[in-house]
Amino acid sequence: MAGQRTYREKRPVREGSPAALHPAEFAKDREYVDVLRWHHVGLSSRFLAASDGDLYGIDLVLAGVMVRSYGLVDGFLDAFDTWNPVVAAPLLRMQLDNLVRVSYMVQAPSASDVADHFVVGGEFRNLKDGDGKLLTDARLLHHAKEHHPWVAPVYEATSGWVHFSPTHVQAAMRLHRDEDGRALVDRLFQ
């Protein structure tokens, strides 16, 4: 069994992984995701050191997001390296949950009130935005789209991986064409 790695240790590209087998398409982006993973630590240190070390509700929420995000990126790399989209896609969707919640919090009329509500155990879905609408996932996406126009289609595409759906059935099949161009379906596990 391999020893535990440190949080800043570079994650080598595994033999047989998509980045190893298709380096032109995946190696650079995979390395970038790994760099983003360990940048979480430095970024967290910087924002937690602001305000002369005093901590506020916003700091606690952001620290929680950073720990969750680090774990999601770390897990994504493992799933990607082992060709496991059934795990990788929901992790990406969970990362989008982080994004839409932080995006709303920082643009809310009172970010401190949102953070304080969350720190004591409240949920975003029980809060209302400036228009008096509950902060459902759809509403959070609405607010995030202003700054992240790409978020809605990615959120939608990855949502199919969270709950059992036709996406999983399609992932269990291998689609290809025969020599005459007819579509064929093979089971993944034969």
State each model region's role:
Residues 6, 31, 154, 160-162, ...:
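Intrinsically disordered, low-complexity N-terminal regions enriched in serine/proline/glycine
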Residues 161-190:
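Charge-enriched, short contiguous segments at helix-coil
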